[in-house]
Curated annotation (Swiss-Prot):
Membrane-crossing residue ranges in chain numbering: 3-23, 28-48, 59-79
Protein name: NADH-quinone oxidoreductase subunit K 1
Enzyme Commission number(s) of this protein: 7.1.1.-
Cross-referenced Pfam families: Oxidored_q2
Catalytic activity: a quinone + NADH + 5 H(+)(in) = a quinol + NAD(+) + 4 H(+)(out)
UniProt keyword list: Cell membrane, Membrane, NAD, Quinone, Translocase, Transmembrane, Transmembrane helix, Transport
InterPro entries tied to this protein: NADH_UbQ_OxRdtase_chain4L/K, NUOK/Mnh_C1-like
GO biological process terms, semicolon-separated: ATP synthesis coupled electron transport
Main function: NDH-1 shuttles electrons from NADH, via FMN and iron-sulfur (Fe-S) centers, to quinones in the respiratory chain. The immediate electron acceptor for the enzyme in this species is believed to be a menaquinone. Couples the redox reaction to proton translocation (for every two electrons transferred, four hydrogen ions are translocated across the cytoplasmic membrane), and thus conserves the redox energy in a proton gradient.
Localization annotation: Cell membrane
One GO term describing the cellular component: NADH dehydrogenase complex
Example of a GO MF term: quinone binding
Topological category with respect to the lipid bilayer: Multi-pass membrane protein
Length: 99
């Protein structure tokens, strides 16, 4: 398969994730869309790494996945805390957490 097709797929995944972040109000769905955008960037990094014949992009993508795993833990903890206090997972309620 042509490597350019992987870049098109990465752009499509990023666009889907960006539209989900802009349109949705549920914090879990927004969080999943952010992760989709992050995985699209990883796919582009690995594709460019493969096209240029070095491992730099793959190493960066690996470390990005490690950081994303930590982000998932912290992000879901915040969402669960928001849900327990407000009984809703809406991002509009997140601004009320400071009260």
């Amino acid at each position: 398969m042509n490597p350019v097709n992987y870049l098109y797929l990465a752009a499509l995944l990023f666009a889907i994730g960006a539209s989900g972040v802009l349109v949705r109000r549920n914090a879990i769905v927004v969080f999943m869309c952010v992760e989709l955008m992050l995985n699209a960037c990883n796919l582009a990094l690995v594709t460019f790494s493969r096209m240029h014949g070095n491992l730099d992009g793959q190493i960066v993508a690996f470390f990005t996945m490690v950081v994303a795993a930590a982000e998932v833990v912290v992000g879901l903890a915040i969402i669960v805390s928001l849900f327990r206090s407000r009984h809703s997972a809406s991002v509009d309620d997140a601004s009320l957490m400071k009260l």
